[in-house]
Structures are given as C-alpha cells and as structure tokens.
Amino acid sequence: MAWTSVLLMLLAYLTGCGPQPMVHQPPLASSSLGATIRLSCTLSNDHNIGIYSIYWYQQRPGHPPRFLLRYFSHSDKHQGPDIPPRFSGSKDTTRNLGYLSISELQPEDEAVYYCAVGLRSQEKKRMEREWEGEKSYTDLGS
C-alpha cells in the first residue's frame, strides 16, 4: 500500500497534477485618463506568493493576449517587448497579492488584463531537491 501512495504522489508531481495555485481578480476596475490604476491578483491562501513570479497579460478587443511583464521582486522582473515603463508590477507578500500598476492611463489601455503565476526557476529547483529528499526518505522507510 505504501508503494501505491508513493507512486501516486510521484505521478501527480511529475504530471503537474499536484495542488495548483489559484488566482482571483476583481471583475472590473476603472479610472480616468491620465490617472494611475492598480489591478490586483490574489493567490489562494494555500500558496505563498513570495515564491511565485506574477505574469500579466493584456487583451484588447479583437486582439490576442499580449505579454506585459513578469514580476518576482524589484530586482527580478522582466518587461515584455515594446511595453512602456508606465506598466509595472509589485507584490504584497503579507496579503498574498500581486499588482499591475498602469500610470498615465490612455484610451488604448482599455482592455481585459489577466494574471498568472509560475514558480521562479530557483524555487522550482529547491522544491525538486526537497522532493527527491522526501522520496529517498520514503524509500528508506519501506
């Protein structure tokens, strides 16, 4: 029976079927032209936003989604191609929130904005090492 549990956990881990983070966004936000707006993305409580990068996408009517930016920290972020610096990311790790700020709002900023999260590669490697350690420990206990 122990082998079955280990095998199922391993399959779930390798296929990405383990507990996945859920994000929630408010359905609507509005502001005036020229102003600054901050959109939020809440990560489910069973995950810590501190170990995730937040990805933001914009979809204008009649256009495919386009990548705006990735934000992990002030020193670890990436702006999408041709995305002006008036689009910026941030996090509130205490409240488990990610933010997209858009300053100097323009008419073309009217769009649907999506957030997504992904493990930072260094954190993913650390978790894989921990998993290997747990797997070895489980093997020793059998």
Curated annotation (Swiss-Prot):
Disulfide bonds join C41-C115. Residues 57-70 are annotated as: Framework-2. It holds the Pfam family V-set. Keywords: Disulfide bond, Endoplasmic reticulum, Immunoglobulin domain, Signal. GO terms for molecular function: signaling receptor activity. GO terms for cellular component: endoplasmic reticulum; external side of plasma membrane; plasma membrane. It is found in: Endoplasmic reticulum. Residues 20-41 are annotated as: Framework-1. Residues 42-56 are annotated as: Complementarity-determining-1. Residues 71-81 are annotated as: Complementarity-determining-2. It comes from the Eukaryota. SMART domains: IG, IGv. Interacts with IGLL1. Interacts with SYNV1/HRD1 (via N-terminus); this interaction leads to increased VPREB1A ubiquitination and degradation in pre-B cells, possibly through a lysosomal, not proteasomal, pathway. Belongs to the immunoglobulin superfamily. PANTHER family: IMMUNOGLOBULIN LIGHT CHAIN. This is Immunoglobulin iota chain.
